[in-house]
Amino acid sequence: MSNEESFTEKPLKKRSRAHRLGDPRFYCTYPDCPKSFTRKEHLRRHERTHENVKAFSCSFCNRAFARSDVLNRHVQQMHLQKQNLSERRMLNASCFLGFCVLAHDYVNLINARHFMIEHFLSLFAFCRTILFSLLTSFLLVPPPQFFHSEAGERPTPSVGAPSSLASSMDSVRVAPSMLAASHQIVPQYSENNPRVSNEPPRVTIENASLKPFSGYIKSHMSTSNFLNGEPDLNVNVDLSPFPNLPATVPITQAASTANAFQQPSNQFQTQKLPSGLDTRPVSSYPDELTQLESNPDSFSRLDLQGDCTCIFKNRSSIASSRTMDDVVRWLFSSGKRRQKYESSYPYQTQSNQIPSQDQYSDTDSNFLSYYFSASGPMYVPQKCPATVYNNLLNFLEGSFHLQPNFLAMFTLESVSSWLNAYWSMFHVRWPILHRGTFQITQAPLDLLLSMITLGMHSSNDLSIRSLAVEIHTTLRYNIYQKQEFGPPVSLWVYQALFLIQVFELFTSNLKQHRLAQMFHPVLIEAMRQAIPSDALTVRSETFGESNTPLTLQQWHKWITRESVKRIAFFVFALDSTSTLVFGNQPLLYVTDVSMPLLAEEHHWEAENFEVWAAQKPTIEPPTILHMLKAFVQCEQCESPLPKLSPWNMLLLLHGLLSVDISLKQKKFVPGMKLSKREIDGWCSLVFEAYQKWNRCYYSIFLNNNILPFGHPFVKECRSLYNLACIYSKTRLTYLQAFAKAVTDPVDGSVTSKTVAPLRYVKIWANTENARYSTSNALEILDMLLREKIESAPRYDTLIYHSWCYYVAALVLWSIGFALDEENKKTEEVTNLHSQMSRYVTKVRQALEQGEPLFAVVEKSKNPIILHVVLQALDVFPWDLLGEHKKIIQQLLSKGND
């Protein structure tokens, strides 16, 4: 059926007069979008909903709009009408000031009794001059430029422009303090006579009408460049596969306030201070950080000769989005276009080629096999010292005010077991602490508690897990009140806050999860404000080819430097995970962590200095950006790549996900002047990079039995890969909206609410995107069949592993509902797992042989898949899964009707 016929069959919808059968229609070129329009301007307006680009911004309040007429109406109603009222009030106040001066001079004339007639005539001339100057100052000043097609085309006042023109954008903002500011007279500063007289200045005809406004302008010029002269577009893109989940608290204002003090105000620029004084304001950042965005070459990676680096490259999310444009063009450039974009790429080194495989040592398979097995001296239980235990009890009783029954659970043996559980279970997934130099006796109690509570989470006792949640209600705020949280912030503070956030994501409490989403931007913003004098900056003096013996000081510097990289990379991983699973706005991009990848794990896990010095790392790992380019630009999928550690491979997957999310948002389309088809081609290259990553991961770690299939770390890697692939090819919001509409208790299987989602599902089910998503969903179900479903709740180190089951069930149910027209009833069977296993094997073999989906999918198998997935989700005690489990239950009840 053609699209034209589909429109003719719409029931109960009046056809437009302008549209007749046979007229040309303009179709949306975005994949899986079935919409078409009779007018081209309507199509362009619809395309902006895909791109979500708001190119028309208000010069007053920096609000952004997708249409120019809406911007014009906003300016007229919200600003110009108020501006006229404020101008009249300002004129009345200024006239009152002028007449006061006139009366004062008139009294002086009466007292002087000299040349009365001459002064009386001059009073009228003076009054006329005042009124004329007031009218010209308001009527002849050019208004601010509101209407521009692009946000970046707004004219900025030049240095030599008049003060009235340069401050026209601020002069229209009438504050309550305007009248008081208009009476302030700025004292004249002179190099020859720096003293300021205490006598009131004499008002003359030349300065009577200009001084009040110049004082107001100078007092408010500091806020005119709040965002460095660029508007905050406030682009909000719904990337959520699950739109009803709690979203992150918006922090665009908090993330952008970092740029407020990067440029000193005009008062500091005009006054000349003595040469011995610093002309930079106290609140401004160091010069080397203000130059980071314009000339970031020296900060692109940790230099081998001892240059300093900051934990995050960009000081704000706005700067991150700008640098992401150049990175995307550099990643996908090839041939002539590569030469064009590489000149502006800020992360170039002397050689952009990826080092070959023989330049890196092979992954120590014996170490990894030993590391991922819960045995060996690495996991020898250690006992907590009695002094640390007593200090911990006093700390809990004094700062947390725990009840006596809770304090009784903190025995010396239990604290030791919880610490050992952290090292054996959670350190494998988040290795941010250095085990060789970590000493319990010297660790801060807040950091120690964050480790202990993670170990308490693995307990099967509900009271112990409740105690851990009770501690976390105060632990974060207790760290905020520490002296170490102020600048310069200590490294252990960031490590403790990161572990707290991981704990809140693990717990099943909805309140704890929302706290993690709320305070995640706070952690990122605190890490952005780190300056080179803080503890987060170290020097790279370890790497090199010199044969000089290493010292203990160099080892500690290397540990600090590696700790900084790990906390930065893992915070970035959490941010990309929240964007993928929970639909939050990305606060970090891969450009923020443009650093070399993590060092080999056997270097990081060295027990002492002698072991580390014996296996001295002589070559630094490649940067994450160059490895991403290797995956994207690799023409032959089977070409060899450097063998990286499992943690670096997972970081590369997060980097690909960050690039994919940036392409989906289309933030940089107007500036880059690219077509949507080219952007879609780039998305296809990212999907091919996903597949390349999966083949490399299997060939390096799984096929050689280096990593066990059942390890939680491996499960999380495979889960993230399948989720990213499905996200790249499927709009899960449409699928879930359709599932909710089907379960709506209305007579009839198809209602007015299900027309649009059903049309998308039917179009999507007949494309190649559905085949890719089906393949990933089958792999997720295969992981489910390999696991042992227990009746007791499971508390492990997986964050988003359970979400894969719901996504896979949603994808397969939608395809079966759309392609299979037959309505067969499900046979009553006792062993659902075996029947689902046969169905998964059948569909997978058909896809490998190239058969179409409609020939192999069966709608009658949907209840079997939903039953098994619902049984698996009941094992994970997450409150966030409650609504999705309810959707599955409603689908099952709907199918049985």
Swiss-Prot record:
Protein name from the UniProt record: Zinc finger protein zas1
Assigned keywords, A-Z: Metal-binding, Nucleus, Repeat, Zinc, Zinc-finger
Q: What does the UniProt entry say about where the protein is found?
A: Nucleus
**Keyword Flavoprotein belongs to the record:** no
The processes (GO biological process) annotated in the record are: DNA-templated transcription; positive regulation of transcription by RNA polymerase II; regulation of transcription by RNA polymerase II
Q: Which PROSITE patterns match?
A: ZINC_FINGER_C2H2_1 (PS00028), ZINC_FINGER_C2H2_2 (PS50157)
Alphabetical list of InterPro entries matching this protein = Transcription_factor_dom_fun (IPR007219), VerF-like (IPR051059), Znf_C2H2_sf (IPR036236), Znf_C2H2_type (IPR013087)
Which Gene Ontology cellular component annotation is one that this UniProt entry carries? nucleus
Q: Which SMART domains match?
A: ZnF_C2H2 (SM00355)
Cysteines joined through disulfide linkages: none
Q: Identify the CDD domains for this entry.
A: fungal_TF_MHR
